[in-house]
Amino acid sequence: MPFTLGQRWISDTESELGLGTVVAMDARTVTLLFPSTGENRLYARSDSPVTRVMFNPGDTITSHEGWQLHIDEVKEENGLLAYVGTRLDTEETNVTLREVLLDSKLVFSKPQDRLFAGQIDRMDRFALRYRARKFQSEQYRMPYSGLRGQRTNLIPHQLNIAHDVGRRHAPRVLLADEVGLGKTIEAGMILHQQLLSGAAERVLIIVPETLQHQWLVEMLRRFNLRFALFDDERYTEAQHDAYNPFETEQLVICSLDFARRNKQRLEHLCDAEWDLLVVDEAHHLVWSIDAPSREYMAIEQLAERVPGVLLLTATPEQLGMESHFARLRLLDPNRFHDFAQFVEEQKNYRPVADAVAMLLAGNKLSNDELNRLGDLIGEQDIEPLLQAANSDRDDAQAARQELVSMLMDRHGTSRVLFRNTRNGVKGFPKRELHTVKLPLPTQYQTAIKVSGIMGARKSAEDRARDMLYPEQIYQEFEGDTGTWWNFDPRVEWLMGYLTSHRSQKVLVICAKATTALQLEQVLREREGIRAAVFHEGMSIIERDRAAAWFAEEDTGAQVLLCSEIGSEGRNFQFASNLVMFDLPFNPDLLEQRIGRLDRIGQAHDIQIHVPYLEKTAQSVLVRWYHEGLDAFEHTCPTGRAIYDSAYASLINYLGAPEETDGFDDLITSCREQHEALKAQLEQGRDRLLEIHSNGGEKAQQLAQSIEEQDDDTSLIAFAMNLFDIIGINQDDRGDNLIVLTPSDHMLVPDFPGLPEDGCTITFERDVALSREDAQFITWEHPLIRNGLDLILSGDTGSSTISLLKNKALPVGTLLVELIYVVEAQAPKQLQLNRFLPPTPVRMLLDKNGNNLAAQVEFETFNRQLSAVNRHTGSKLVNAVQQDVHAILQLGETQIEKSARALIDNARREADEKLSGELSRLEALRAVNPNIRDDELAAIDSNRQQVLESLNQASWRLDALRLIVVTHQ
C-alpha cells in the first residue's frame, strides 16, 4: 500500500479508534497515531487492515477546530489530499482544508461513508437488517397490533373489548364482565396496546391488598409488563431518590388502603402525571349521595387528574342502580351528575334492548316496538331499514345487524360500559360436585372441646374461623409434636383418590400454606406421589417452576398443593380435578378456588371433590354453599349479597356446628333468596349491551386473524437469525421449547430482556399457556422488539459487499442494492406508525440507473450471492469508488418519486380515517351524551398534528450492498 506521512486512514477492525494519521514508516511497517484516543498501532505495510479515508465532492467534512466544509473539489499533492469548498459557518468560498487537519473523532454513520471507509459488515447482517425493516413495517400496520403478544387464549369477547377500548384516546370505561370471563386480561390487553402504541407511558393500578401479587404476576407473565409494587417500605425508600416517590417508576401497583391512608401520599399519587389509572374491585368503593366513603373520594381525586381510567367491577345488576351510577360518575362526572335522571334514562333503554333481542332472535316486531326503534334513531330516515329487518326478505338479516349497530352507537352507556355474561359467552365446562362425608377423629373432638373452654371470650367470628380448620386447633395444643395427618381421615381419602387416579392431574387447595407443605411431605413419604407446592411464601420464579412441573405431561407432578393466597391469579385449565381439602370462609373465595380450573378454554367438565368432617363447621358450610347457594355447580352472582344478609346466623352455626336447630330453615330461606335474586338479575340483563360487549361476528374474525398470524412461521426463522447475530446461544429442548442463554461474544454485554441465567421460550401459544416458565415469543415480545431496536438503531448490516457468480453478465459488472427508509418524526402518542411506519424501499441499480428490484426478488437474489472478506472488500471499494458514487446519485434522484407516493398515501389514509372517526362521533354526540367533548377535541387535535407530521416526512439511505459479478 502506498503510505505517506500525514495521510488519514481508518482501522477496519477497530473503527472506534476514529481517524488515524500516518506518523512513521519503514520498508516493512507503518505506524498510525489515533489522536481521539491517543493510541498508536503498528501494521505490516504489505497487508494492513486499514482503509484510506478519502472524501468526494458533495460531502461535508469537519475540521479539528469544529467548523464544517462542503467539498467542491479534491486536490492531491505528493500523496496527500486537500479539500476545497465552502465553509458552512462563515459561508466563505474556496476554503482549503488539508486532510491532516480533519477531525479525528470522525464517526461514519451513513452507509456509503461506512462502505468507503472500509467498515464492511457481514452479508447475513445486511439481510437481517432489511428483513427487520420489512417485518417491523408490516407489524406496525397490522390492525390488531398490541393484541397478539399476550399469553392468553384467543377469546373473542376479550379481544373485542380490548380492540375497541385500546385504540381510544385516554379511554374511560367500566369493565363489568361476570366472574371467570377475564376482566383482568381485558384490562391487561388494553394497557398493552396503549403502552405499545405510545398512547400511554405511565400507568397506576390500584387493587385490594390481597390481589397485588396476582396483578403483578398476571401483568408480567401474560403481557411482559414489569410493574413496581409500592408499599410503605418501597415508598419510604423512593423518597430518597425523588421528591415524588411515584415518579421513580413508570408502571406502579399499590393497594387501595395504601393509597388512601396517608394524605401526603395521595397528593403524591395525584401529582405523578399518570396516563392511565386501573382500579380493580371498584364495586367495593362505597358511595351515597350524602356520604361517599374515603376510598371512593380517593379514587375520585385520582380520576379527576388521570386522563384514562379503567374500572373493573361486578356486574351492574349485582351492584344495584345507585352503586352502578357511582362508578359511572367516576368516569364522567359531567355526564353522570344526577342519579334520578340516570334512573329515568335507563328505563327508556330497556324496551329498546328487548326489541333488539327479539329482532336478533328473528321474531317479528309489533308496531309499538317498531315505533320505539324509530324514535330512538330519530335523525335518520330508517323506515326502509325497519321494514327490511321485519320482513322475510333475503336482506332481512343484514338489515337487523345494521339496526343493532346503529342502536349500539346510541345506546345509553355502551361506550363506557362493557359487560359479558356466561349466558352470552359460550365455552364453559360443567361443574360436578362430589362430597365425601368423613368421621370426626376423637383427637379433634378433644381439641375442639378444650378450645371451646379456653376461647370462651373469643368473638363468634373467630370461633367460627377456628372451627373450619380443626387440624390447626389440634396443632396449637400439641405444638411441633402434633402429627394430625396420621389420623385425619381426609388425608387417607386423598391418598386413596390420588393412587386410584394416577394418570390424572389434580389441584388440591387448602386455606393455609403450612397445611399444603405438610400434605406434600405425607404424600411423598407414604405413597411416593409427585406433588408440587404453591404458597405465598414462595417467590414468583419458584411458583413458576412448581406450576411448570405440574404442567409437564409425563414426568411432571400429579398433584399441585396450593394455599388460598398462593393460588391467586393462577389458572390451570389443563387439569379438571379439584380437591378442596377444607372450605373458605365466604362465597367469593369459593368461586375463586373453582375459577382456577373453570375458565374459558377448559376442555373437560370439572370434578369438584370436597372431603369434609361431620359435626364440624365444614359440614355446615358444605350444605350452605351447595343447598343454599348452588355455589359449587354454578357461578353464584348472588353469593355476596346472601352471605351478608345471612352472616349473623351462619356465624353461629359455624361456631357451634352440633347445634342444628333452624339450620334447614336458614338454607331454605337462602335458597329462596338466591332464586329470587337470580331471576331479578336475569330480568335486568341488558341484551343490547351484551351484544355490543361480546362483539359477535366481528370478534370471531379478529380471533381468527390473530390465530392465522400465530401459524405464520416467518417469525421463527427471523428470531433464530436475530439471536444468532446478536450472539445469543440457543438450545432446542424439544416439545417446542428453546433455552436462550447469553454468550461471551454478544453485540451488547447485557441484552435487555434476557436474564443472566437465560430463559426458556416457545413460539406456540398452547405450550406457553401450559408452561408458565416459558416465555411466549411473538413480534410484540420485548426480546424481539429490543432485538429489532438494537439492529435498526445502530449501523449493524448497513454496508456490505457480495459477489454474484453469473456467467450471463460480464465480469466486473457492478450492481448497488439500496435500502431507503421513508419515515416521519413525531411524538410517540400521535401513533404515526399506523399510517407511515419506517418503511423500507428497495432499489437494485446498475451503473446506468436501471432499477431491477421489481424483477429480482430479495430472498432469491440473496441466496445467489457469496460473501467477501473485509480486506478484499476494501480493495474492491477503492477500485470502484467513483462508479458507486455515480450510482448513488442516480438512486437519490429515483427514490423521491417512490417516497412521495408512500407519504401521499399515508396522508390520505390518515385524513380519511381520522376525519371519518371525528365526523361519526360528532354526529352521534347529538344522540349519545356519553361521547366526551375532550375525546372529540383530542381526535381533532391528533388529526391536525398527524397530518402536519406527515407533511414533514422524509427519506434516507439506511443500508447498501455493493455487488460485483464474477465467473469464479
Curated annotation (Swiss-Prot):
* Motif DEAH box boundaries: 280-283
Cite the Helicase ATP-binding domain residue spans from the record.
Answer: 164-334
Q: Which domain of life is it from?
A: Bacteria
For molecular function, the Gene Ontology terms on record are: ATP binding; DNA binding; helicase activity; hydrolase activity, acting on acid anhydrides
Keywords, comma-separated and alphabetical: Activator, ATP-binding, DNA-binding, Helicase, Hydrolase, Nucleotide-binding, Transcription, Transcription regulation
**Disulphide bridges:** none
Which residues does the UniProt record annotate as the domain Helicase C-terminal?
490-644
Pfam families for this protein: Helicase_C, RapA_C, SNF2-rel_dom, Tudor_1_RapA, Tudor_RapA
Binding of ATP: at which residues? 177-184
Give the EC number. Answer: 3.6.4.-
An individual GO BP term: regulation of DNA-templated transcription
Quaternary structure per UniProt?
Answer: Interacts with the RNAP. Has a higher affinity for the core RNAP than for the holoenzyme. Its ATPase activity is stimulated by binding to RNAP.
Q: What does this protein do?
A: Transcription regulator that activates transcription by stimulating RNA polymerase (RNAP) recycling in case of stress conditions such as supercoiled DNA or high salt concentrations. Probably acts by releasing the RNAP, when it is trapped or immobilized on tightly supercoiled DNA. Does not activate transcription on linear DNA. Probably not involved in DNA repair.
Q: Family assignment?
A: Belongs to the SNF2/RAD54 helicase family. RapA subfamily.
Q: By what name is this protein known? A: RNA polymerase-associated protein RapA
Q: Which organism is it from?
A: Salmonella arizonae (strain ATCC BAA-731 / CDC346-86 / RSK2980)
Q: Which gene encodes it?
A: rapA
